[in-house]
Amino acid sequence: MGVLDKDQVATFKADGVIHVPRAVDGALVEEILQSVDGLIDSPGRFGGDMSPGDAPGMFFQDRYLHPVRPDFRRFAENSGLAAMAAIATNSKNIRLYYDHVFVKDPGTQEQFVWHQDRPYWAVDGTQICSTWLALTDANSQSSALEFVRGSHLWDRTFRPEYPALEGLPPKEVERALWKGVAEYIESFEDICPAFEEHPDLYDVVSFDVLPGDVLLFDFRTLHRSGPNDGINRRAAISWRWLGDDAVWAPKVGADPIIRDEDTTLEEGDLITDDRVFPLIYGR
């Protein structure tokens, strides 16, 4: 666990995403899945069903669990994926930004549009990535992730869309969220096209995954997930990892799980606040 070979590292650097089969032990995957199932009945502060009230199915999400749930902190430490992130990003140290759970039931039509994680996160750097651990089978029919290969190298950050508010004018998004979001959204000139409709221009790839498989991707890599038109529930957990050059970069449009007042860091500081960003791996 946590080991990548030279070819995998080279692919990650070129494509911004790699598929690592059987990256996490099956017993740990089952233990994580049991904890995730329990979250649905008793979600955390940031958890809940993201589907509209009258929509079929369920798109459950929860995040930032490791500070309040010892089991989720242990999962991050024992998965071996921080070491994998260190190898992929060529970092000596890896800190945990947050964990993020996704559960999508069959028939759920809710989806994530094309996006990069960068504009939603209050950090910046070139050694920042996610490991998306499959807890169930998933394929293109059942909402497996899709990526635009090489998009992390474009030196472009696309306009963010916010869950359940996709396509709305920025002012309407701001009314639903918080002050300043409209101006933040409008500061991005590039708007994501339908990359999948232009195979001659963009290299879109998806991966069929089994429980224990991991998708490791750069936080600048464009990605999305579609509806679950399969017959089984799709569940996964992501850990967001910060490598050596990650800095604190608060943004008005960033996820409010960690705010300026929550950390001792000043804008532009290297991430060193152990209380808020625990060191999971060091070498």
Protein language model features and the residues they cover:
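Non-heme Fe(II)-dependent double-stranded beta-helix
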Residues: 1-15, 21-114, 119-122, 252, ...
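Non-heme Fe(II)/2-oxoglutarate
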Residues: 46-51, 161-163, 211-216, 220-283
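Short, charged/polar surface micro-motifs in flexible loops or helix N-caps
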Residues: 81, 91, 106-108, 138-140, ...
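Generic beta-strand structural signal
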Residues: 92-94, 98-99, 110-112, 127-133, ...
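A short secondary-structure junction signal
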Residues: 108, 113-114, 125, 141-147, ...
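Short, conserved beta-strand element in jelly-roll/cupin
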Residues: 115, 122-140, 208-211, 216, ...
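Glycine-rich phosphate/pyrophosphate-binding beta-alpha loops
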Residues: 117-119, 128, 223-228
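Double-stranded beta-helix
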Residues: 140-221
